[in-house]
């Protein structure tokens, strides 16, 4: 399949703070027949929103480098930053990463803001840093090593596989599936089924118009105001509180 690379608009670098060098880049890819965006990113924050008025995918990237002179920071960014977006068939592929130098480690990150057209599904493979997705229309698939994940005001199914870090999901029209190693999970105002597999950490699920399934090893579980059935498999160590369930409640050891 033909691989089309899109050019990068480079804005002037600036010194945000006395010890932080910041450089801003913007990437634009016409959406056309694209129905899926795949994001591979390393250290840094990630914010995604649906921009219904746009017919292209727009990426704003802030590259931050700590404790280097402006000249050294520019040289580091030029040599070690990988930032590009390509079109392959009906998919857009975004890569945002930093090469790590172990002999002389540098504290650096790439913070991303991504605007996508309505109906474009997003698949995320993230290293570390907070992820915030809101006012989004499309399906989401998130694979994350660590960091806070916030998903709110979404129309579409959401799937999250997380190593560690807090997960917040609120006001979603679609089914939810979460697989979490450690960290608390908060799920609120969902119109769809919820399925959670958790290693450790508190789980709070409330106001769900659908069925709820939880598989848990340890940590407190609070479930309330559910219109469908609730199934708890292998409740581990931790308090279990279940209230105001319209369907059946089943616990399996």
Residue ranges and their predicted role:
Residues 1-7:
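Positively charged n-region of N-terminal signal peptides that target proteins for export
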Residues 1, 17-20:
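Low-complexity, intrinsically disordered short segments enriched for Gly/Pro and polybasic residues
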Residues 7-16:
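Bacterial N-terminal signal peptides
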Residues 20-126, 132-143, 148-162, 168-179, ...:
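Acidic (Asp/Glu) and glycine-rich low-complexity loops/linkers
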């Amino acid at each position: 399949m033909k691989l089309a690379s899109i050019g990068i608009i480079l804005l002037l670098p600036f010194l945000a703070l006395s010890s932080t060098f910041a450089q801003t880049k913007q990437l634009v890819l016409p959406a056309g027949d694209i129905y899926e965006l795949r994001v591979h990113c390393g250290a840094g924050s990630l914010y995604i929103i649906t921009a219904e008025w746009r017919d292209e995918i727009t990426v704003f990237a802030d590259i931050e480098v700590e404790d280097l002179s402006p000249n050294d920071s520019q040289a580091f960014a030029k040599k070690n930053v990988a930032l590009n977006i390509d079109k392959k068939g009906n998919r857009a592929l975004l890569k945002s990463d930093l090469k790590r130098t172990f002999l002389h480690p540098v504290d650096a990150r790439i913070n991303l803001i991504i605007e996508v057209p309505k109906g474009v599904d997003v698949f995320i493979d993230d290293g570390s840093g907070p992820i915030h997705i809101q006012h989004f229309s499309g399906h989401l698939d998130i694979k994350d090593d660590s960091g806070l994940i916030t998903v709110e005001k979404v129309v579409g199914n959401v799937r999250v596989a997380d190593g560690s870090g807090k997960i917040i999901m609120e006001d979603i029209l679609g089914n939810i599936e979460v697989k979490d190693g450690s960290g608390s999970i908060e799920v609120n105002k969902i119109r769809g089924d919820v399925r959670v597999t958790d290693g450790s950490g508190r789980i709070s699920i409330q106001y769900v118009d659908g069925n709820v399934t939880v598989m848990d090893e340890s940590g407190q579980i609070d479930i309330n105001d559910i219109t469908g059935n609730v199934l708890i498999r292998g409740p581990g160590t931790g308090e279990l509180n279940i209230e105001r369930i319209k369907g059946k409640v089943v616990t399996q050891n």
